[in-house]
Amino acid sequence: MNKGIIGKKLGMTQIFLEDGTRVPVTVVQAGPCVVLQKKTAEVDGYSAVQVGFETVNAAKANSADRGHCVKAGKGVFRHLRELKLEQEAELNIGDELTVQQFEPGDLIDVTGTSIGKGFQGVIKRHNFKGGRASHGSRFHRAPGSIGCSATPSRVFKNKKMPGQMGNERVTVQRLQVVRVDADQNLILIKGAIPDSKNNVVVIKDSVKATK
């Protein structure tokens, strides 16, 4: 991964391109993020950088957080994330990552937490068809049989059944950067991304970046 940054989802809107095309976009306030720690393969077993986003009052942070951020000299940060960047060796503690590393047309992957839907049935959770809506069937939204008979006398793992839906880590791939506003640290991404408004998402180069 060559590029990466942490941002806060602000919401969705729509913009018009020069040819008049209307494009739905998600607005993300991305960075600036400060490099707080470098992890190397020799010491940690892998190479990455830990970055901080959104400063907070140092008086509200515990001593461990204050001590961890003091080397960067940029304050104490609310959100810490690790990014595996190829240019990890070129980054030093205290360096900043900004939206200027992205350009319109770039393909990115966005990682966030999907919105929780609570306990849901198989029709909403797994797109089951459901039974006939006829009189006397008594089978409308039920999942049906979940296993076999005496052999194997159990329910197989990963069987699609009712349960908790959403509220899990999700990555949406190959989203396109429509516009970058370096003055306000905003990046406009085509389409929808995971997570709710004002929550933190991770933006990075797409692993399927072929245009």
From Swiss-Prot:
Gene3D superfamilies: 3.30.160.810, Translation factors. GO terms for molecular function: rRNA binding; structural constituent of ribosome. GO terms for biological process: translation. Keywords: Ribonucleoprotein, Ribosomal protein, RNA-binding, rRNA-binding. GO terms for cellular component: cytosolic large ribosomal subunit. InterPro entries: Ribosomal_uL3, Ribosomal_uL3_bac/org-type, Ribosomal_uL3_CS, Transl_B-barrel_sf. The keyword DNA repair does not apply. Part of the 50S ribosomal subunit. Forms a cluster with proteins L14 and L19. One of the primary rRNA binding proteins, it binds directly near the 3'-end of the 23S rRNA, where it nucleates assembly of the 50S subunit. Belongs to the universal ribosomal protein uL3 family. NCBIfam families: L3_bact. This is Large ribosomal subunit protein uL3. The lineage of its organism: Bacteria, Pseudomonadati, Thermodesulfobacteriota, Desulfuromonadia, Geobacterales. The gene is rplC.
